[in-house]
C-alpha cells in the first residue's frame, strides 16, 4: 500500500473509532480479533469431535432440531451441565412448560443455580432472552422451543384465526436484535426446534423447521438429531441409539456425524462412546465380544466394558485423552466430566 493510501486509511479508521467507539473496526491480525474460538462441550465426545472445534462455539446462535423424543432437550441439558462444571451461568427459557427438573438433576445439571423462565408469549420469551444477553453475565441461554414461541396476537385471537407468517416475523426481528449482542457478550444461545412436513412436496426432503428461515441464516451451527435404534438389556429397552448430523457449521467443515447412546435416566453414555471411538482409533482392542486396553481385558460385551470404565474413571480419562490426541482435539482437563459421573454413581 502506498504512503498516501496508508495515510487515508489511518484517517478513516480513526474517524470510525471516534464515531462508533474503540474496537468498532480492527485488523484480523490484532489479538482481540484473531483469538481462538471458545467452546462448551456437548457432553458427547463424538459430537465434540464432529463439530471440529471441541464443542459448541460461544458468542454464536445454535439450532438443534429433530423429531419428537429424539434427545434434543437431553442434549441441551448435558451442555448446561458441562458449562456449569466450568463455572458458567445458564438460563433455560421453557416456552413448552415441560422441563423435568429431576431429570435435569440426574444429567448433572446444578438445578439450584439454573435460571428458568416459563413465559406466556413468544414476545415475552424473546424479550427475556434479550435482557439476559444484554446483562453480559449469562454464559448460555436455551430456548425450548421455537415452535412454542406463540405470538401474543395468536394467543389473544380466536382458535381458528389465520395469522400467516406472524411467528416467522417475530423470530426474524428478534434475531436481528440479538445477534450482535450475543457476539459482544460471548453468550451461547441454543434454540431447540421441531420438525414439520411441507404439504405437496413430490421430490426432495418434505421436512422443514418452524419459525421461518431467519434462524437458519443466523445460526452458526445447526444440528439434526435422530433416534436410529433402541438399546436393550435382556428384553428391556434401556435407551436409544442416537445420530447427530452437523448440517451447518460456520466454525469448521460441516456434514460430519456422531453416533452415541442416550440411556434413560442417565443421558449420553460417555463410557459407551469411549469404547466405540477407542475401537475405531485402534486404542481399544476388540476380539469377539471381549474388549481390552493395553493388553488387559476390560469386559465381555459392551455393557460390561462400559461398567468397567464407569468404575475406573482414571482409565476412561486416559483412553479419552488418547482418542482426542489421535484426532487433534484438545485433551480433557483432569477431573472434568468423569468425576461428575462417579459422584452420580455414588449417590445411586
Curated annotation (Swiss-Prot):
Question: Where is this chain's protein located in or outside the cell?
Answer: Cytoplasm
Return the Gene3D superfamilies for the record: P-loop containing nucleotide triphosphate hydrolases (3.40.50.300)
Keywords carried by this UniProt record: ATP-binding, Cytoplasm, DNA damage, DNA recombination, DNA repair, DNA-binding, Nucleotide-binding, SOS response
Q: Would the keyword Hydrolase be found if you checked this record's keyword annotation?
A: no
Which SMART domains did the record assign?
Answer: AAA (SM00382)
Record-listed ATP binding positions: 66-73
Where is this protein chiefly located? cytoplasm
One Gene Ontology term, aspect cellular component: cytosol
Pfam short name (any one): RecA
GO BP of this protein: DNA recombination; DNA repair; SOS response
In this chain, the stretch annotated as Disordered covers: 327-348
Molecular-function annotations in GO: ATP binding; ATP hydrolysis activity; ATP-dependent DNA damage sensor activity; damaged DNA binding; single-stranded DNA binding
NCBIfam families reported in the protein's UniProt record: tigrfam_recA
Record family assignment = Belongs to the RecA family.
> Which function does this protein serve?
Can catalyze the hydrolysis of ATP in the presence of single-stranded DNA, the ATP-dependent uptake of single-stranded DNA by duplex DNA, and the ATP-dependent hybridization of homologous single-stranded DNAs. It interacts with LexA causing its activation and leading to its autocatalytic cleavage.
The protein's matches in PANTHER family, at most eight in alphabetical order, are given as: MITOCHONDRIAL DNA REPAIR PROTEIN RECA HOMOLOG-RELATED, RECA
> What is the name of this protein?
Protein RecA
Origin species, per record, is Burkholderia multivorans (strain ATCC 17616 / 249)
Organism lineage string: Bacteria, Pseudomonadati, Pseudomonadota, Betaproteobacteria, Burkholderiales
Per UniProt, what is the name of the gene that codes for the protein in this document? recA
